[in-house]
Amino acid sequence: LAAEVKGCLLISHNRIEIMWVSDRVTVLRKGKCIGTVETANTTAEGLSAMRVGRNVSFHVEKGPLKPGGEVLSVEHRTVASKVHKNNAVKKVSFQVRRGEIVCIAGIDGNGQTELVYGLTGLEPLVSGELFLCGQDITHTSIRKRSTMGMSHIPEDRHKHGLVLDYSLEDNMVLQRYFEPEFTDKAGFLRRKNIRGYAERLIEQYDVRSGQGPVTMAHSMSGGNQQKAIVAREIDKDPELLVAVQPTRGLDVGAIEYIHRQLVAQRDEGKAVLLVTLELDEVMDVPDRIL
């Protein structure tokens, strides 16, 4: 279109796309115009600093790899596709150990979603076995997998990560509301405890919301919705963290934050399974790539 002498307005926060496509960039932050620069006269790092108000590191700092025992074992697993009425994943086997980040990479639509659905219990397996910390979880429920030490940052935060019409504090205890800390013996929610727990996570994980724990999830930005999910899943102190496209649609500041949280889990001796389509993420974050 530009070659045909037509004007194009591109709205994006993908730094690669911006640097590749645009001729001139205007940066907005918190509703204000920060500045306009010629793309040829700036860098991705410079644009990122304008966008978030500070320097952002694109390099993921990790300590030396010290893998421990096996946490997740997937043996000859087959998962069906509801869309194509065939097996999207056929006889897949792999393991994830403590203290490492393992990445499943590939072009979208090649079985990653079905693989994760089978792993987390969202869809049943056609065949194969799953073991978490040596225990067979092949046919266990989603709640059971969660209480056994599996956390899941889902691909679609609106469909599987949050209840958008719930408050932030209610979303923070979606998988733990039945615990004695949050529900009394008569079955009533301990609202004071839930509020205190949510306030702690909001502060600890820098989740920004207009009304704190009573903020409705649908009113939050995508980045802060994702931070809330990350806070909830990591605070469960999981043995295995399954993170599926955890930085999709996020700005560079939120991406940096998510990467640091994944690496922190790895450095604490947790097992992390990362599923992503982002090439930079594939090359920078994991210790092994499948």
Region spans (language model):
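Glycine-rich phosphate-binding loops of nucleotide-dependent enzymes
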Residues: 1-290
